[in-house]
Structure formats: structure tokens, C-alpha cells
């Protein structure tokens, strides 16, 4: 995966930097797709950033029987950055943004309501879908591993 990181991370970093967003978000596709642009989930998510059809279309990715821009590293990265930026505009908390990226803003909003309006990830943890409860810690671990793999 480190070889793939050398190819894809500069694409991710350029797009994130252009929008003044945390460069650590480049690790999301590690969790989403293991940096495989052809990855396809059981739920129908596709590409490096694992866009669902509806989210991909919302962010202007062309998806037809001939073309699927969710698999295009540059176009899907630009769309993912716009989506992450929109989520940050809603939550103003990067951990909640990462959770919402995984399970959708509707599920995060429901978890916040069920937690009495608390907006701290760890306060809403048990009200999130099981997959998302593992997703955020996996993202944190990927950050650590990729940042310190030379020291291991």
C-alpha cells in the first residue's frame, strides 16, 4: 500500500491544500478502499473515496454505463474534498465529519439527537452505526501508521 500512497497522496494533498483543509484527510481512502480506485462495496459505493451513486451525482461526477468518474482519482478526489468541506460546514468538527463521511449526515444527526444534542464524537459513539464506531478509530490508526511507519 505504501507504493500506492506515493502515487495517490500527492493528488489528495494538492486538492486538500487548495481548499485549506487538513492534509490528514488523505488517509480516508486508505480506510475506504485500501487505495484501490476500482474498489466496489456491497452497498454500491465505488472508487478510492467510495462514493455512493447519489452522492457522486450530487457532487457532479458522471456515472453512466460507459463512464464512472467515481473511479477517476483526480475527479473523485475533487468531489470528495467538496463533500468533506460541506460536511465541515455542517458539523465544524473533523471527527464528526469523518463519521458523517462514513455513515451519512442523517445517521450522525440521529446520533446527536439520541445523545441529547451532544456534538462530541465520543458522546454520540454508542448511537452511531456499528461500522462507524470502528471507522473513526481506524482512520486515527491509519494516520498514526502512515506518519510513523519509518519508526516501526
Specify the residue positions occupied by each region the protein language model found.
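Solvent-exposed loop/turn segments at secondary-structure junctions
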Residues: 33-36, 55-58, 104-107, 145-146
Amino acid at each position: 500500500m505504501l507504493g500506492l500512497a506515493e502515487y495517490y497522496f500527492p493528488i489528495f494533498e494538492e486538492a486538500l491544500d487548495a481548499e485549506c483543509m487538513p492534509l490528514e484527510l488523505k488517509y480516508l481512502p486508505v480506510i475506504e478502499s485500501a487505495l484501490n480506485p476500482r474498489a466496489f462495496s456491497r452497498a454500491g459505493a465505488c472508487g478510492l473515496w467510495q462514493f455512493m451513486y447519489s452522492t457522486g451525482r450530487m457532487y457532479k461526477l458522471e456515472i453512466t454505463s460507459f463512464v464512472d468518474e467515481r473511479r477517476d482519482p483526480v475527479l473523485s478526489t475533487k468531489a470528495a474534498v467538496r463533500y468533506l468541506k460541506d460536511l465541515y460546514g455542517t458539523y465544524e468538527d473533523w471527527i464528526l465529519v469523518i463519521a458523517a463521511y462514513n455513515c451519512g449526515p442523517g445517521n450522525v444527526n440521529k446520533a446527536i439527537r439520541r445523545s441529547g444534542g451532544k456534538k462530541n464524537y465520543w458522546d454520540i459513539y454508542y448511537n452511531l452505526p456499528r461500522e462507524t464506531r470502528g471507522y473513526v478509530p481506524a482512520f486515527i490508526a491509519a494516520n498514526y501508521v502512515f506518519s510513523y511507519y519509518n519508526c516501526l
